[in-house]
């Protein structure tokens, strides 16, 4: 029965090795959980920034469309003024030629 006392120290050693491995895995898992939580926080911040950027882009698009329309009308007015001046000039020339 000498196997009883010698088996106990070997068994304790294996149990201690297993416990050390379990502790190591637990530490690794804690680090992994912390990394996942950090990643989640960063993703949340990135999502918020993306939403803000989308809102800014929509506002820019609206402002650009209004500005485009404003300058289109301004261009139309300039063409109308130019055509009116040209017509008045042509009428003056016609009246001057006819009256001469």
Swiss-Prot record:
GO terms under cellular component: cytosol; early endosome membrane; neuron projection; plasma membrane; recycling endosome membrane; synapse
Domain v-SNARE coiled-coil homology: 14-74
Subcellular location(s) per record: Early endosome membrane; Recycling endosome membrane; Synapse, Synaptosome
Gene3D superfamilies in the cross-refs: 1.20.5.110
Transmembrane segments: 78-98
Cross-link (Glycyl lysine isopeptide (Lys-Gly) (interchain with G-Cter in ubiquitin)): 66, 68, 77
Assigned protein family: Belongs to the synaptobrevin family.
PANTHER family in UniProt: SYNAPTOBREVIN FAMILY MEMBER
Assembly information from the UniProt record: Interacts with POPDC1 (via the C-terminus cytoplasmic tail). Interacts with BCAP31; involved in VAMP3 export from the endoplasmic reticulum. Interacts with BAIAP3; this interaction is increased in the presence of calcium. Interacts with PICALM.
Protein name: Vesicle-associated membrane protein 3
Organism encoding this protein: Macaca fascicularis
Higher taxonomy: Eukaryota, Metazoa, Chordata, Craniata, Vertebrata
Name of the encoding gene: VAMP3
């Amino acid at each position: 029965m000498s196997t009883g006392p010698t088996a106990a120290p070997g068994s304790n050693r294996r149990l201690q090795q297993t416990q050390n491995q379990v502790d190591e895995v637990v530490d690794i898992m804690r680090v992994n959980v912390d990394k996942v939580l950090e990643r989640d926080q960063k993703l949340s911040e990135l999502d918020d920034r993306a939403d803000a950027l989308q809102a800014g882009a929509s506002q820019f698009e609206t402002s650009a469309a209004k500005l485009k329309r404003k300058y289109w009308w301004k261009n139309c007015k300039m063409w109308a003024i130019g055509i009116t001046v040209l017509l008045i000039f042509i009428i003056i020339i016609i009246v001057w030629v006819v009256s001469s």
